[in-house]
Amino acid sequence: MLAQLPPALQSLHLPLRLKLWDGNQFDLGPSPQVTILVKEPQLIGQLTHPSMEQLGTAFVEGKLELEGDIGEAIRVCDELSEALFTDEDEQPPERRSHDKRTDAEAISYHYDVSNAFYQLWLDQDMAYSCAYFREPDNTLDQAQQDKFDHLCRKLRLNAGDYLLDVGCGWGGLARFAAREYDAKVFGITLSKEQLKLGRQRVKAEGLTDKVDLQILDYRDLPQDGRFDKVVSVGMFEHVGHANLALYCQKLFGAVREGGLVMNHGITAKHVDGRPVGRGAGEFIDRYVFPHGELPHLSMISASICEAGLEVVDVESLRLHYAKTLHHWSENLENQLHKAAALVPEKTLRIWRLYLAGCAYAFEKGWINLHQILAVKPYADGHHDLPWTREDMYR
């Protein structure tokens, strides 16, 4: 039976079962843990030279089904791709143009899916960014609260500080900073769905005198240095390589002298920012984050410094994000019946692959998560930061 498959597939030894449209099935190794159901004959040819993008696209379009644990399916599919995919198939990075209209459309595409859909698998505060696990067995809710606190501690946030939250999402960090640190917060987003629910939660907690959430593009931020601290969490991935300098200049102009800026976001493995993961990056660009671009740590750090800010602290949270994504993926998999009632089948397929696939990508080191803390020095070059980092952990 195995002889009916193309030679490239016959020679593989993977814990994978191929089940064909005609009922035939083939085990590519002992004790298969994952089954790929190929529903169309022409897909067999693609499987002899597959990329993660091709496999993902076939699943999203319903031409291929995955049976078994979704995380294990991602791993086995990557092993299949690794065995048959060549370096020549990799494409050079494509630089994207970004303007207010296209960025707003991209944000709406990703974040305006359904508040109820996000609530199924996010934590209670709906923090859609990397959590911070002080202990590996902490719950997602606890880890997200600890992330908020970790950011506020790094920013040395004090009572009465005016904090700018760029890409505030549903306002979880803004409300935490106001509630726990007595800060005044101005949060901006481009998502109308996020803004609506975020404002409802601000009102429900009685924080309307401290938290102001608005629709505003970062390019339109006031440049009079009115903010004591600036935080940007999971937002700069949407900025694009071409606009990194402008983005950092806007943060510089928004914060006062002596103030602090925190940039928390996903970074690329390669210095030139090219996609990794044998087509995984292309899948995300096509279906999940249109126009998204991940810069390397060196690229965003250089842009921060060129804008006039001084980088004073950098921390990698790569494995924290892998664990966060595992929580999200598991939560979604446990709520598939509810999710199917909230979003179209194609959307649900995209998100199942995206969450499990990103968890795998962070584990493999294809992408990273860095928190970069910077200060805007006074005119004479000094600043007020402590001589050590010890205060952040007291």
Swiss-Prot record:
InterPro entries: CFA/CMAS (IPR050723), CfaB-like (IPR048027), CMAS (IPR003333), DUF7884 (IPR057206), SAM-dependent_MTases_sf (IPR029063)
Official protein name in the record: Probable fatty acid methyltransferase
Upper taxonomic lineage: Bacteria, Pseudomonadati, Pseudomonadota, Gammaproteobacteria, Pseudomonadales
Organism this protein belongs to: Pseudomonas putida (Arthrobacter siderocapsulatus)
GO BP terms, alphabetized: lipid biosynthetic process; methylation
Keywords noted in UniProt: Lipid biosynthesis, Lipid metabolism, Methyltransferase, S-adenosyl-L-methionine, Transferase
SUPFAM superfamilies documented for this protein: S-adenosyl-L-methionine-dependent methyltransferases
UniProt binding sites for S-adenosyl-L-methionine: 128-129, 163-171, 189-194
E.C. code: 2.1.1.-
A GO molecular-function descriptor: methyltransferase activity
Pfam family, one: DUF7884
Homology family: Belongs to the CFA/CMAS family.
Active site, per annotation: C358
